[in-house]
Amino acid sequence: MPLEAAATQSMSKQHKAFLRKLYLAHLMDDERHNLLSLNKLTGMPRRTLQDSIAAFEDIGIRVEFVQDGNRNNAGYYRIVTWGPISSAWVDTHVDEIAAIIGVNASSETLA
């Protein structure tokens, strides 16, 4: 089912959670992000971000936190592999995904 058709129908929580993971993985693959920058960029609550990132493995995406400094939380997330997911497909549909999950995709750069 195309994303446009899915967006017009009622979408399950699971489907939105799946799309949220794809969107976050896209952001992490494009730039270096930590929880704070993802929170500012997406407006998603910190706990939602943590839960989504922790569940990446459920859909085959492997992510790691790269320590960048002395503090434990100083660093960024890096996508190790997209697994069975086509990152090119996500890149092509990122605006649609963002609209469905309620995020403004045009604000993908931090000021």
Stretches found by the model and what they are:
Residues 53-58:
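Residue-level detection of the helix-turn-helix DNA-binding "recognition helix"
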Residues 19-26:
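Pre-recognition alpha-helix immediately N-terminal to the DNA-recognition helix
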Residues 81-111:
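Helix-turn-helix/homeodomain-like alpha-helical modules used for DNA recognition
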Residues 30-34:
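Short capping segments at the starts of secondary-structure elements
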Residues 47-50:
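Key DNA-contact positions within bacterial/archaeal DNA-binding proteins
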